[in-house]
């Protein structure tokens, strides 16, 4: 699925991606000389709120090894950004204990479905079982009243 590219917004994402890589100690420039690299990093850090200059800096100075990773990260971020706009495509996360995740994963494999679909299926089954149980209880109570 294609998503609209928003240059200013994505330039900010790219800046943040490279900033985080730099903070983690990775080389974000194409330069080998440490003084030249540091100089270009300092220039880069000043460009945070200048999207056009960020894109120019990336074209001229970014480490070529990061090119594909950056594209993939931005593509994923773009997808999440646009999916978050609509309620039915918005993703939610939950924390599961490992053994719970393992059971859910096995059940999903048995049903040949996603984890989300499996959770939805299990909830509907539980609801159906609860309604059936209430109906049986109601019938028992009615029968008990009739037999008095």
From Swiss-Prot:
Belongs to the MatP family. InterPro entries: Arc_rbn_hlx_hlx, MatP, MatP_C, MatP_N, MatP_N_sf. One of its GO terms (biological process) is cell division. GO terms for cellular component: cytoplasm. GO terms for molecular function: sequence-specific DNA binding. It is found in: Cytoplasm. It comes from the Bacteria. Homodimer. It comes from Aliivibrio salmonicida (strain LFI1238). Required for spatial organization of the terminus region of the chromosome (Ter macrodomain) during the cell cycle. Prevents early segregation of duplicated Ter macrodomains during cell division. Binds specifically to matS, which is a 13 bp signature motif repeated within the Ter macrodomain. Gene3D superfamilies: MatP, N-terminal domain (1.20.1270.380), Met repressor-like (1.10.1220.10). This is Macrodomain Ter protein. Pfam families: MatP, MatP_C. Keywords: Cell cycle, Cell division, Cytoplasm, DNA-binding.
């Amino acid at each position: 699925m294609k998503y609209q590219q928003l240059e200013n917004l994505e330039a900010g994402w790219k800046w943040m991606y490279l900033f985080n890589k730099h903070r983690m100690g990775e080389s974000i420039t194409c330069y080998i000389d440490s003084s030249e690299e540091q100089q270009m990093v300092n220039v880069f850090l000043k460009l945070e709120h200048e999207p056009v200059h960020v894109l120019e800096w990336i074209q001229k100075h970014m480490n070529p090894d990061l090119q594909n990773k950056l594209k993939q990260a931005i593509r994923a971020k773009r997808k999440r950004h646009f999916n978050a706009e609509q309620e039915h495509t918005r993703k939610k996360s939950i924390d599961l204990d490992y053994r719970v995740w393992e059971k859910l994963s096995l059940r999903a494999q048995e049903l040949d479905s996603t984890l989300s679909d499996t959770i939805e299926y299990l909830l509907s089954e539980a609801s159906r079982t609860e309604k059936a149980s209430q109906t049986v209880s109601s019938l028992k109570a009615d029968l008990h009243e009739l037999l008095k």
